[in-house]
Amino acid sequence: MKLSIITPYYNCLNYLQNLVKVLEPQLTNEVEWIIIDDGCHEQELDKIKATIIHLLNNSGCAGVPRNYGLDVAKGDYITFVDADDLVSKDFVSKIINKINLTTFDYCLMSWEKIDKSFYVDVTTGRPDWNCSVWGVIYNKNNLKNVRFNNKKFAEDYDFNQIALKGKEERILDYLYFYNSNENGLSANWKG
């Protein structure tokens, strides 16, 4: 297995259905999609062509379901896709192509906000300020002792402070589309 895609999920079925339409057709025998249901147990999830793991209780943070995904992932490389975001129609093929061309410890990909009000072009972006785990492909060997903390916010920033080490690669294409979901954890931060 070359790639594991890990998606933490909690009560955003409408968004997830849009992601399924784009991502599910891209899945191959080299790629697994793991969706971690963080305590909402929606029946619709079981119809998706992915490994679904149902957690009994809501953890209240994205780190716990992401850690479950890391624990069961079989891919040599791992990436995270939030359930309320979208990916390009060639998301998987571009990542697999990069994996086949070279080895790396992590790979950054360009992304933009769905409403196009903000973007990150990795030709100019610096990995030391990358505070999100989506938009990054990680070599699983480098994550053996790296896990998310249980904070409600900034857990991905803390994760990346440890994980973004070693040989870096970049995919210049815009493969990831971030959605600022008004009901999501980031939008409701009261820091």
What are these regions (language model features)?
Residues Y15-Q17, H41-K49, L86, D90:
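Acidic helix N-cap motif at the loop->helix transition within catalytic regions
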Residues L56-A73:
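Glycine-rich, basic loop-to-helix element that forms the pyrophosphate-binding segment
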Residues K2-S4, E32, D158:
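Cell-envelope/extracellular polymer assembly enzymes that use nucleotide-activated donors
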Residues T123-G191:
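Conserved nucleotide-sugar donor-binding catalytic segment
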Residues I78:
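Short aromatic/hydrophobic "clamp" motif used to bind/position activated sugar donors
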Residues I35-L45, S59, D82:
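A conserved acidic beta->alpha catalytic loop
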Residues C12-P25:
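Short, well-formed alpha-helical segments that are part of the catalytic scaffolds
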Residues L86, D90-Y119:
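Conserved donor NDP-sugar-binding/catalytic core segment of glycosyltransferases
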